[in-house]
Amino acid sequence: MPKEYTSVSKISGPLVLVENIENVKYGEVVEVKLANGEIRQGQVLEAQEGAALVQMFASTQDLSLKGMRIKFLGHVLEINLSPEILGRTFDGLGRPRDGGPEIIPQKRMDINGSPINPYSRAYPQEFIQTGISAIDGMNTIVRGQKIPIFSGAGLPHATLAAQIARQARLLNEEEKFAVVFGAMGITFEEANFFIENFRSTGALERTVLFINLANDPVIERIATPRFALTAAEYLAFDLDMHVLVILSDMTNYAEALREVSASRKEVPGRRGYPGYLYTDLATLYERAGRIKGKKGSITLLPILTMPEDDRTHPIPDLTGYITEGQIFLSRELHRRGIYPPIDVLQSLSRLMRGGIGEGRTRKDHGDLSNQLYAAYSRGLEAKELAVVLGEAALTEEDVQFLEFAEAFEMEFIKQGEYENRSIFETLNLGWKLLRRLPRASLKRIRPEYLDEFWGKEDAS
């Protein structure tokens, strides 16, 4: 039976120092009983011989050293799991926030989990359709991939995240597909937007939400993505489901990590973030993937807002080293009213080749994508030249590529918030746009594909 201690020696901000204790471990859950009988929870941040530093999950402003009783429960944070979590909304610590009952567990799991052993990993493949042309056609996401969305303050990443969560599916309808959504440090309005969006579109029944609000404790923000990923591991590897995990906003998570690090008086690293930021992010991102011999998979889509749109900031910089590409949102496209404002030239899916082609999407997908990239890039070069020298200085072919680039942005990249394009609609739209250009200029596409698809209005 856990012992109770009254040896609290100091309260500093959200931290409580407990002395004269024994057999306490890092990450252990703590129960704090106040003099008035109220019970609060915390977690051991640091354990040394005879002392422990506890981070509270609630405010410490009204705490007093007198009458406090501390009980170390002997286990780390765990989550109750069963198939009933689908369709439910929880707070950042896995407690129901939708008014529903507590989950009766079929299994309890430690939220810290562990990264997948590289030897046990299966190579990510199999196309995931998001219904968004700039992603499906140009930066394809495959099952088991981890690919972040790099955004900026004021850009519609929340709307894009909700759209992906609603529309994402495998082309094989027989596969069981679920979405786990972990929100960190968001406002009440944003939380309500996600919940109502999923409910009104019928996507809630296959979704699990973990929501940490901006006014919730910082330590809870650090736990939220771990609760979300643990739920995803259960759905994927125990129930054989294919799970898409969306984590938003990882910048709020990193800020919380910096705040906790500062409260512990740790030596800061780049821009005040702890030196272990890279390692900490890796413990989250590397939990995504496929495991040999398991039917299920976890695909991870973390969203982060780059402070001051700075892609060299430690958070996007370190994220890029761990993940397998990025989807980049453009402020310039957003300013021109293009949604989703995905900058396809700065975006990249490193595992795209494993998820496209004959038997997965369509045999012309790879060549078509390469040609669209090349044509769009040349069109933007012509646009820059026209700004400097005027359109009169452009050749006839330059003008054609310039018009193609404008049409590509307005017809291919731009689409409605509730517009769900199939991969075949996306590919056919790409061919439709390429017909604006001389056939001889399409040098990235094999002649046999040109012969087969150039004259077809719709192919499947």
Curated annotation (Swiss-Prot):
Swiss-Prot/TrEMBL GO biological process terms: proton motive force-driven plasma membrane ATP synthesis
Gene3D superfamilies the record matches: 3.40.50.12240
Bilayer-spanning residue ranges: none
Single GO term (MF): ATP binding
Keywords of the record: ATP synthesis, Hydrogen ion transport, Ion transport, Transport
Top-level taxon in the UniProt lineage: Bacteria
CDD domains assigned: ATP-synt_V_A-type_beta_C (cd18112), ATP-synt_V_A-type_beta_N (cd18118), V_A-ATPase_B (cd01135)
PANTHER family per record: V-TYPE PROTON ATPASE SUBUNIT B (PTHR43389:SF4)
Biological role stated in the UniProt entry: Produces ATP from ADP in the presence of a proton gradient across the membrane. The V-type beta chain is a regulatory subunit.
Similarity remark: Belongs to the ATPase alpha/beta chains family.
Protein name (database record): V-type ATP synthase beta chain
Primary gene name: atpB
